[in-house]
């Protein structure tokens, strides 16, 4: 009997957390109807700022420039697209009228596998839908493309909170109601993915708010993580580096003298342990900047100088 009561208490506590998060977030997540020359599409968006900005997925916006946002209380607002970044699958819109205050945004870097998460969105046109689950995995990678440009969205959150078409652009929140991710994809039954809220994402959002786009630097390398031999790992205090698989012809990396087979250890002294660590260094401030790349070639240490150009999607 005592065990049954204790179990009921746990379920009641779980329900209170989920309902509290839902009560806080539902008014702050809008149903979006995007208008474009190719027709209308739908999704969700989360209030981003107190002056009318909304955050959603780039694939929800598509080629549209205008949208209609409807909130849980039935109020609507026209919104225009402020900026789109297809290489992070994020977009920012601005409403033409006062909208609810934004929720608190958290940091996905503090999540752990097994943490409770709550998804709020508008799946299949059903506004204000709430599902709950746990963080199933962290550090997933989601490849994205814009024209000829490719990128990996880093540290994607995997959850078993049910996601369906229309959830895209909605909020994934922790048990305290802080938005830690933007729901982006349904990867299978019981498997959803969300773009994490972290330092890199915040930098992208800042660029979209202020510039309407995200400028990135381009080296022209195709790499894959590779383990370092124990002696090298101890010497450089890192276990992995990036093995160069391909150097794009006439690229900054080619001009610098990098070759397939090189093991890239660091850029400007910052260790490279995975593709994401390189991506984090290739934002606007790296364009045309003198960049020192440290690599191992035939067991010898090599330093080369590159001048990254601006990444384009053509």
Q: Which ranges hold each PLM region?
A:
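Serine-dependent protease modules
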Residues: 2-233, 238-240, 283, 299, ...
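PDZ-domain C-terminal substructure recognizer with occasional recognition of PDZ-binding tails
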Residues: 206-213, 243, 255-259, 265-271, ...
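A structural signal for short, hydrophobic beta-strand segments that form beta-sheets
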Residues: 81, 135, 244-247, 264
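PDZ/PDZ-like domain micro-motif
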Residues: 168-171, 227-235, 248-266, 281
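Residues at or immediately preceding the N-termini of alpha-helices
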Residues: 108, 198, 250-252, 275
